[in-house]
């Protein structure tokens, strides 16, 4: 049985308007993580990553740098119980 994990992440800094969501979606699909990503009105990006623990950890680590034009200042990670409800990875508009 796979070791599953779920991370609820809030990323602060210059993370909107820098292709963060599309890059997160592409990397999530590459590493095989389900979930979603969206911009928040306060300028942060919020995301949920669920899947095999090692893949979720790769996504969380990626959030500390993000795409090349992002300037990440802080990452708030909340580890939650996996729900198994996520299917694929999407951008919430």
From Swiss-Prot:
Name of the protein this chain belongs to: Acylphosphatase
Pfam families: Acylphosphatase
EC main group: hydrolase
Catalytic activity annotation: an acyl phosphate + H2O = a carboxylate + phosphate + H(+)
Keyword Hydrolase among record annotations: yes
Keyword Cytoplasm: no
Enzyme active site: 21, 39
GO terms for MF: acylphosphatase activity
Enzyme Commission number: 3.6.1.7
Keywords, comma-separated and alphabetical: Hydrolase
PANTHER family given in the database record: ACYLPHOSPHATASE
Natural source organism: Roseiflexus sp. (strain RS-1)
Domain Acylphosphatase-like: 6-93
């Amino acid at each position: 049985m796979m070791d599953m994990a779920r991370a609820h992440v809030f990323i602060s800094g210059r993370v909107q308007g820098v292709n963060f969501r599309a890059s997160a979606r592409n990397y999530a699909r590459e590493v095989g993580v389900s979930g979603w990503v969206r911009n928040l009105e306060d300028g942060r990006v919020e995301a949920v990553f669920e899947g095999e623990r090692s893949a979720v950890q790769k996504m969380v680590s990626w959030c500390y740098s993000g795409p090349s034009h992002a300037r990440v200042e802080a990452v708030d990670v909340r580890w939650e119980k996996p729900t198994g409800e996520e299917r694929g990875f999407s951008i919430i508009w």
